[in-house]
A protein has these predicted regions:
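Hydrophobic alpha-helical transmembrane segments
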Residues: 110-117, 121, 146-202, 245, ...
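Flexible cytoplasmic inter-helical loops of multi-pass small-molecule transporters
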Residues: 2-3, 143, 194-220, 408-414
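Helix-loop boundary and gating motifs at the non-cytosolic
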Residues: 5-63, 220-271
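C-terminal transmembrane bundle of multi-pass solute transporters/carriers
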Residues: 57, 67-71, 78, 82-94, ...
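Core transmembrane helices of Major Facilitator Superfamily
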Residues: 119-131, 325-336
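Short hydrophobic/alpha-helical segments at membrane-entry points of transmembrane helices
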Residues: 21-22, 108-115, 231, 316-322
């Protein structure tokens, strides 16, 4: 009976018209985004063969989230998020066109790649914040947890499929083919956003406050909440110590495993397979109870999987480590996202969820720079082992508080 109820929660989530259209449009955007990301990563490695440059490019993609996500969240709480995400999506299409065109005419260099990466990195805080605010408007509250997990499953299933497709495209059409694919996928997503029909939210209260004051409100809200504060700290350490290893995979493929674009695609796909399985598990189980415990398990598992990955030079064991990193990171991040969404007042959701974006999308930039710097001195494997051990050590400070954290979210959440 339990399994039937959990499967029913997935069907109910997909029965909502706007949610189904929204996810159907995001799917090709996610898919071709991963295709382009593999192409850009391999292009950066071909241009420089430098782990430090890989860290710089990864940081350029993610660092704007650190600065802009809080402002994007506050802005999203002041406006209708649907026109905002449409504008952001159109801009992403333009960036993909520029990547393709400049590669075709031979004007692409590491500096140009860096500039275009920074450009699109500045767009994604607004796109992601608007997306986070739109999801609750497309779904009934009782179907929200599986809806969040399904959105994550879409993202990570494409993380498995996208690199595999990129591995086929690059030998045939070079990296330019990956950029062209993203033009098409992003355009399809834009069309789906134009088909959404959502009631504009009431933003009258938010517009009366200073933008920076609203950002400060969200930070104070999260700091006072007995559950949000430690959960966000866990997310921070995972995002700095473990998640950046995914951005260093081109270096592991070429330097540690003595491979090329094929091995890079295998590793990226393995991370995606693990993450997809984790997301479908969260969607299948449904409900809020037990998500705090799953968050802790995911955090610990990601650190152990990272240690297993950096400890080997055998590609097959490395692929298992990649899958473990993807699985455990995703059950942690998806559970964290669902807990935060359901524990936060509607008027604060855009700003509070922007903190999630700052940490999970932005903090890996700092981690990538750190790993890149340590790697230039001691090698990728030692750098990866060091940050994984730091991640696991921090967990020991949070475990004694697990029961109190769970109570603040699940019994039901207490709001400050």
């Amino acid at each position: 009976m339990d399994g039937a109820r959990q499967r029913s929660s997935i069907r109910r989530a997909l029965s909502h018209r706007n949610f189904a259209i929204f996810e159907a449009g995001l799917l090709p955007h996610y898919l071709t985004g991963w295709i382009q990301r593999v192409g850009a990563g391999w292009l950066a490695w071909e241009l420089t063969e430098s782990p430090a440059w890989l860290g710089v490019i990864a940081a350029a993609d993610l660092a704007p989230m650190l600065v802009l996500a809080p402002l994007a969240g506050a802005w999203t709480d002041r406006v209708n998020p649907l026109p905002l995400i449409r504008l952001a999506q159109a801009t992403i299409v333009v960036q993909a066109v520029a990547m393709s065109a400049l590669t075709y005419v031979g004007w692409m260099s590491i500096e140009v790649l860096l500039a275009l990466t920074i450009f699109v990195g500045c767009i994604y805080p607004f796109h992601s914040s608007a997306r986070q605010s739109i999801i609750p408007a497309t779904i009934a509250r009782e179907d929200f947890a599986p809806a969040v997990a399904l959105d994550s499953a879409s993202f990570h299933s494409t993380r498995f499929i996208g690199p595999a497709i990129a591995a086929l495209i690059i030998p045939l059409y070079d990296v330019q083919g990956t950029f062209i694919a993203h033009v098409g996928g992003s355009a399809i997503c834009l069309i789906s956003l134009l088909l959404l029909r959502l009631k504009p939210p009431d933003r009258s209260q938010a517009r009366g406050r200073n933008l920076l004051a609203q950002v400060a409100d969200s930070m104070a809200y999260a700091t006072r909440h007995n559950g949000l504060r430690p959960i966000l700290l866990l997310l921070t350490f995972a995002s700095v110590c473990v998640r950046p290893l995914q951005d260093m995979l081109p270096g592991f493929a070429g330097d540690v495993f003595q491979g090329g674009a094929r091995e890079l695609a295998w590793m990226s796909s393995s991370v995606g397979v693990g993450a997809m399985i984790g997301a479908f598990y969260i969607a299948w189980r449904g409900g809020l109870a037990g998500l705090t415990r799953i968050t802790m398990i995911g955090y610990a598992g990601s650190g152990l999987a990272a240690l297993a990955f950096v400890a080997t030079q055998n590609i097959w064991i490395g692929l298992l480590g990649c899958a473990g990193i993807g699985f455990f990171l995703n059950i942690m991040s998806t559970s964290t996202q669902a807990l935060m969404q359901l524990a936060t007042d509607d008027a604060m959701r855009g700003r509070v969820m922007s903190l999630y974006l700052v940490i999970y999308r932005g903090m890996p930039a700092a981690g990538a720079l750190l790993i890149g710097f340590i790697s230039s001195l001691f090698g990728l494997r030692i750098a990866g082992a060091l940050v994984a051990l730091i991640s696991l050590a921090f967990l020991l400070t949070i475990l004694p508080k697990q029961a109190a954290i769970a109570a603040s979210f699940e019994n039901p959440p207490r709001r400050p």
